[in-house]
UniProtKB/Swiss-Prot annotation:
Tree of life domain: Bacteria
Enzyme class: transferase
Gene Ontology CC terms: cytoplasm
Source organism of this protein record: Agrobacterium fabrum (strain C58 / ATCC 33970) (Agrobacterium tumefaciens (strain C58))
N6-(pyridoxal phosphate)lysine modification, residue list: K246
Encoding gene, per UniProt annotation: argD
Subunit structure: Homodimer.
Protein name: Acetylornithine aminotransferase
SUPFAM superfamilies according to UniProt: PLP-dependent transferases (SSF53383)
Highest classification ranks of the organism: Bacteria, Pseudomonadati, Pseudomonadota, Alphaproteobacteria, Hyphomicrobiales
């Protein structure tokens, strides 16, 4: 175990687990214990661990060139951007190293759009309570959660939160200074909460009516996680700008900001930049991820396995009502809203060597790699059931 006085910032409440290697949906500790990884690095390891195509891609690129900066053309960027724009609403792509950076780019793109159109007063962005958009000063302001804002000085100006799904509050918040609306198609850290499709369609209508840009944060929902390449495809709504990260790198730090040509029109030479973003290693991995995710039949298999898993969780909810209150989510972005404290259920799952991720609203996220098989999904269900059964037995003993 780690030393008590490790020379690290004390910013993480880490579980006492040390993983030495991974294979597919499994992680192995230094002592050889095997865990079913339905945390996937918080929806990052889209193709599981040590996927041979990703390993080969990064090995091959590592023997060529790692980094040159954006002072020069990077062929891998052009290839990956072309594939992303051909498969989405977007015309333009800016590569980053993380989701927070992708959101920063999205925010700057929206503000710069209005500035370049002669409306510098339009800089405010409306967001929704319970959202999570990153940990930079701007993105914690966008998220609006006090626990992340506390102690870092005045909140960055220009972000207005409204209650999740509140149409009247949203309409009232739009002013002559509003530049954009920013929303997650499904809130991840907020507790796997999905707004109604009609609400997202209303956002699109309001943006069109008031000359606002619609920004989707698909950092967690994107790249096959919901069973579609991007979650917006399931809503009937296309954004103007979209932030992407996590699954697109399959575990390698990679993010992107996608936009229509019009929305990106203000992002001219010199107004934004990155040193590492779009580096050749990241581009090799991103292209390798898309080789797999965009292959014929892959997303259909994701949807099939997701159905097995979702139906199984629904059955467990019925059988363990004192432990499981509700099943939420889409595809392989699923949440268990617990009746017991979610930390207790997460700990019980970990005792069964199953990994999940805590979220808000007393929810545990289950985020299996997209390569999970139906058999592995059933193994996960068996472990959730064992955890629920142990908590039920514990409750009975107390009673």
């Amino acid at each position: 175990m780690a030393e008590a006085a490790a020379p690290l910032f004390d910013t993480f409440a880490r579980a006492p687990l040390r993983f030495e290697r991974g294979e597919g949906v499994w992680l192995f500790t230094e002592s050889g214990e095997r865990y079913l990884d339905f945390a996937a690095g918080v929806a990052v390891n889209s193709l599981g661990h040590a996927h041979p195509h990703l390993v080969e891609a990064i090995k091959t690129q590592a023997e060529k060139v790692w980094h040159v900066s954006n002072l020069y053309e990077v062929p891998g960027q052009e290839k990956l951007a072309k594939r992303l724009t051909e498969a989405t609403f977007a015309d333009k792509v800016f590569f980053t190293n993380s989701g927070a950076e992708a959101l920063e780019c999205a925010i700057k793109t929206a503000r710069r759009y209005h500035y370049s159109k002669g409306h510098p007063e339009k800089f405010r962005i409306i967001t929704f309570e319970g959202a999570f958009h990153g940990r930079t000063l701007a993105t914690i302001a966008a998220g609006g959660q006090q626990k992340y804002l506390e102690g870092f000085g005045p909140k960055v100006e220009g972000f207005d939160q409204v209650p999740f799904g509140d149409v009247d509050a949203l309409k009232a918040a739009i002013t002559a200074e509003t530049a954009a609306l920013l929303i997650e198609p499904i809130q991840g850290e907020g507790g796997i909460r999905a707004p109604a499709k009609e609400f997202l369609q209303l956002l699109r209508s309001l943006c069109d009516e008031h000359d606002l840009l619609l920004i989707f944060d698909e950092v967690q929902t994107g790249v096959g996680r919901t069973g579609k390449f991007f979650a917006y495809e399931q809503t009937g709504v296309a954004p103007d700008i979209m932030a992407v990260a996590k699954g697109i790198g399959g575990g390698f730090p990679l993010g992107a900001c996608l936009a229509t040509a019009d929305a990106a029109s203000g992002m001219t030479a010199g107004v934004h930049g990155t040193t590492y973003g779009g580096n050749p290693l990241a581009m090799a991995v991103g292209n390798a991820v898309l080789d797999v995710v965009l292959a014929d039949g892959f997303l259909e298999k994701v949807r099939d396995v997701a159905l097995v898993f979702r139906q199984g969780l629904a059955s467990l909810k019925d059988r363990y009502p004192d432990v499981i209150e509700e099943i939420r989510g889409e595809g392989l972005l699923l949440g268990i809203k617990a009746r017991v404290p979610s930390g207790e259920l997460l700990q019980a799952m970990r005792a069964e060597h199953l990994l999940g991720v805590p979220a808000g609203d007393n929810v545990i996220r289950l985020l299996p790699p997209l390569v999970t098989t139906a058999e592995e999904a059933r193994e996960g269900l068996a472990r959730v059931e064992a955890a629920a059964a142990s908590l039920t037995a514990k409750q009975a003993k107390i009673a």
